[in-house]
């Protein structure tokens, strides 16, 4: 597979609407790299994991690319280099992606004991796209580690795995969406400042069945339940239940695929904001949860989500903005 990599067909493609922003704003402190992990019941064999990555990467056009700089926009080009090396985890997670140290790829695969880690520069894909790739990587690894699996399941991608790379923002864009994002200064949590590239991690494990039951009792979804708990925790631990002239704001990513019948493996999400304005003392948890849930439900619907991303796409399609050289775009983005 590694010998064949140099003969891959060279293709180029545009970044999706959201992806255009990430190469411009990525820094050592705000890397725009996310991590997905999967834990097996056995120790990881790094050589087999490398073989699995070598095998599936050419199948995923959304991951098998390098980032190029054009006159007006960044763009993707097929990466003909061998797949990035699988490494034993030894650094902070979610470090800034350094393509020149990674065969020009924009993702990393590492392992630690029984865990497989996939770190992705958001320019490639959102969490759902990353999950698709990680699941197939794990499946291929298990086929290599346990050949009897091939006898039962075959040596091919799951029928549920999408390789679609459409820009679903452009496909579902609707003209005449005048509203943009509204923002205001929000309350900022304070704490010990880590050095650049350092990343603090707190791992918590919850029994899914009990979380589902707790959310069901309160007539909310799991996402709404966790968002409400998070907002209430900030309110109690940082504001101590006091009045604040700055609101507590949660930015919640929403997977747009179910609303627009998309199966893309690229970015297709929108951000909505749930705002708690502490204009009185001692909100109860129920009161905070009600405010957060109502804010989310008002925004997480097809009509509102369509307006959000259509506004962004309209800026990208603006002829005057498209004609501005990339070097100038980077100064204002």
Which residues are covered by each model-predicted region?
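Non-catalytic, low-complexity flexible loops and terminal extensions
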Residues: 1-17, 112-115, 124-132, 136-213
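Acyl-thioester-dependent acyl-group transfer interface
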Residues: 1-73, 81-108, 117, 203, ...
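Conserved short-loop catalytic and cofactor-binding motifs
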Residues: 37, 121, 199
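Acyl activation and transfer enzymes in specialized metabolism, enriched
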Residues: 41-59, 119-135, 203-240
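Conserved catalytic core of two-metal-ion nucleotidyltransferases
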Residues: 76-77, 165
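Secondary-structure transition/turn motif
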Residues: 77-82, 120-124
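Short, well-ordered loop/turn elements at secondary-structure boundaries
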Residues: 111-113, 216, 221, 245
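Short, well-ordered alpha-helical segments in soluble proteins
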Residues: 137, 141-145, 234, 296, ...
């Amino acid at each position: 597979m590694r010998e064949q990599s140099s003969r891959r067909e060279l293709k180029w493609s545009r970044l999706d609407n959201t992806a255009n922003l990430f190469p411009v704003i990525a820094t050592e402190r705000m890397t725009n790299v996310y991590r997905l992990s999967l834990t097996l019941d056995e120790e990881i064999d790094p050589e087999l994991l490398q073989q699995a990555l070598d095998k599936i990467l050419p199948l995923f056009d959304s991951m098998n690319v390098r980032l190029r700089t054009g006159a007006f926009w960044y763009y993707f080009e097929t990466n003909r280099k061998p797949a990035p090396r699988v490494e034993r985890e030894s650094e902070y997670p979610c470090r800034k992606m350094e393509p020149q140290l990674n065969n020009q790829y924009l993702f990393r695969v590492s392992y630690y004991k029984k865990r497989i880690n996939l770190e992705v520069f958001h320019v490639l894909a959102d969490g759902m796209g990353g999950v698709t790739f990680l699941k197939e990587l794990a499946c291929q690894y298990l086929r290599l580690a346990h050949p009897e699996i091939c006898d039962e399941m075959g040596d091919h991608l799951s029928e549920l795995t999408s390789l679609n790379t459409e820009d679903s923002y452009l496909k579902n864009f609707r003209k005449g969406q005048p509203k943009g994002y509204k923002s205001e200064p929000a309350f900022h949590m304070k704490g010990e400042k880590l050095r650049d590239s350092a990343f603090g991690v707190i791992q918590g494990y919850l029994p899914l069945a009990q979380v589902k039951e707790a959310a069901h009792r309160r007539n909310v979804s799991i996402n709404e339940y966790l968002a409400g708990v998070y907002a209430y925790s900030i309110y109690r631990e940082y504001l101590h239940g006091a009045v604040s002239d700055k609101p507590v704001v949660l930015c919640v990513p929403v997977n747009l695929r179910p609303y627009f019948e998309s199966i893309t493996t690229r970015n297709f999400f929108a951000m909505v904001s749930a705002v708690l304005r502490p204009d009185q003392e001692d909100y109860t948890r129920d009161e905070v949860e009600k405010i957060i849930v109502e804010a989310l439900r008002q925004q997480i619907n097809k009509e509102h989500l369509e307006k959000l991303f259509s506004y962004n796409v309209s800026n990208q399609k603006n002829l005057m903005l498209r004609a501005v050289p990339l070097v100038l775009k980077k100064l204002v983005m």
